[in-house]
Regions:
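Residues located in well-ordered beta-strands
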Residues: 2, 14-17, 31, 65
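Residue-level signal for short segments within beta-strands and strand-turn junctions
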Residues: 5-7, 46, 66
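Cytochrome P450 core scaffold surrounding the K-helix E-X-X-R motif
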Residues: 40-46
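Active-site donor-binding loop signature of nucleotide-sugar glycosyltransferases
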Residues: 8, 20
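Glycine-rich beta-strand-centered segment in the early N-terminal region that forms part
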Residues: 21-35, 48-92
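Short N-terminal binding/cap micro-motifs at the start of the first secondary-structure element
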Residues: 11-15, 39-40
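A short beta-strand micro-motif
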Residues: 3-6, 82
Length: 92
């Protein structure tokens, strides 16, 4: 899959191929349809967030469609349209 990857603070991120996510029993895989860039992305880009380690996949406000569900997921189905709240940082 493609991702916006920051390799060095205060430089443009690159769009790169990265490994597809692995769907664990308590997770879902979402095909991204839209992703916002916000102030916390700017802080990450500046190097002002001590939790950001490089390389860093940018963007965490997204909407998409579920393409795979884990074995323990009962509330969602493949094909559901979803938004993802900012609870965990990017690239996890």
């Amino acid at each position: 899959m493609k991702a916006s990857v920051l390799h060095k603070f205060r430089t443009p991120p690159n769009f790169e191929e990265v490994d597809d996510p692995v769907c664990r029993p308590k997770s879902v895989v979402v095909e991204l349809k839209a992703c916002g860039v916000c102030r916390s992305d700017h802080h990450a880009w500046l190097g002002n967030d001590p939790d950001v380690e490089l390389p860093h996949i940018m963007g965490h406000e997204l909407a998409g469609v579920i393409v795979e569900i884990g074995s323990e997921i009962k509330e969602f189905s493949v094909g559901d349209r979803v938004t993802v709240p900012f609870i965990l940082g990017c690239g996890l």
